[in-house]
Structures are given as C-alpha cells and as structure tokens.
Regions:
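A cross-family phosphate/adenosyl-ligand binding-site feature
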Residues: 1-182
Length: 182
C-alpha cells in the first residue's frame, strides 16, 4: 500500500490492532507478540472505554514501541502510525461492531474501522459478545453488513465459564490466520 498518511513505511507490513472494552483485552499482548513473530509491526488503537483499565497500556506501548492511540490528533501533529496493511479488531464488542456497521465514526477506533473498510484494507475481527447480546437483531444485521464489505470474522467468544467452570482461551492468533486466507 502507498503511504496515505505521510509518516513513512514501516520496514515490515503494518498492522493496526483495534482493542475494545472486554475482559479478554488484558491479554492483547499475546496478539502483538504473535503478529511480530509472523512479520508484522503493530500499532494499537483502543476505544476510550478500553483505555480505562481493560489492558496494560504501558506494556502494549513497550511491546509495539509506539503510543496507544484512542483520541484524534490535532491537525499539526505528525501521524504516529504508517498506513495499515491490515487491521485486526480484537476483542470486538457488541457496541463497536454495531457502530462500525452503521458508520457511526464517533471514536478514533470506529472511525479507523470505517476508513479501513472504505479503502479496502483487509480487516479481521474476533467478536467478544455476551450470550444475552448476540441474538439482538441489530447485531446479526451488523455482522451481515460487515461481511458484505469483505470483513473476515472469527468464531464468536462470550467469555462465559464452561461446564468445568473455567473460561475458554481467546484465540488471538485466529485473527492473523484470517488475514492470511485469500
């Protein structure tokens, strides 16, 4: 991709990781490490609520070597990330999926997703939506709309305890697998 943002190209393909406010976000470092192992450089954009303690911002910044973004920059500020070669949304919440599908770009995270789909940048999503919210008609319609735009989805994850009482693991690397398929 050309450098639409004027900040120079990364030496490796650049991955935007959009993090939403779900409990599993605390382990987003696993995705960053897996992406680096697969040859990606990453930058993280978080929803404002996710910035409120859902993950360790300092740890993520140390892993990526870049600031975590959640607010728009002012016009004179340099762009902190190069243009994305791909985007991963993990965990993707009910709220973010619905706002994105409706084009409600009221946060940097959702605006970034709207731009990425508009520009044809590959996007992989790992939904993390509660069982009580997943059947809502708006959510199903949003998934259909985003799939129609070429967005790739992993299996849904609720975070609910299984029969044995433990939570199943969140498949962070599945997002990277989704980006590798044609």
């Amino acid at each position: 991709m050309s450098d639409r943002h004027g900040s120079g190209r990364a030496a490796r393909p650049f991955l935007y990781v959009v993090v939403c406010a779900a409990g599993v976000a605390e382990d987003v470092g696993e995705l960053i490490d897996a992406a680096r192992e697969r040859g990606w450089e990453a930058g993280v954009i978080a929803t404002p609520v996710a910035m409120g303690g859902f993950f360790d911002v300092a740890d993520v910044e140390a892993r990526t070597g870049r600031p975590v973004r959640s607010a728009w920059r002012t016009p004179g500020d340099p762009r902190p990330f190069p243009a994305p070669d791909a985007v991963v949304v993990a965990p993707a919440t009910f709220n973010t999926v619905n706002k994105w599908a409706a084009g409600l770009a009221d946060t940097l995270a959702v605006a970034t997703l709207c731009e990425a789909t508009g520009l044809g940048v590959p996007v992989a999503v790992l939904p993390c939506v509660a069982d009580a919210l997943a059947p809502h008609p708006a959510y199903g319609e949003s998934l259909d709309r985003l799939r129609g735009m070429g967005v790739r989805f992993g299996d849904p994850y609720t975070g609910e305890a299984g029969e044995g009482g433990g939570r199943p693991g969140f498949g962070w690397e599945r997002a990277l697998d989704l980006l590798e398929r044609p």
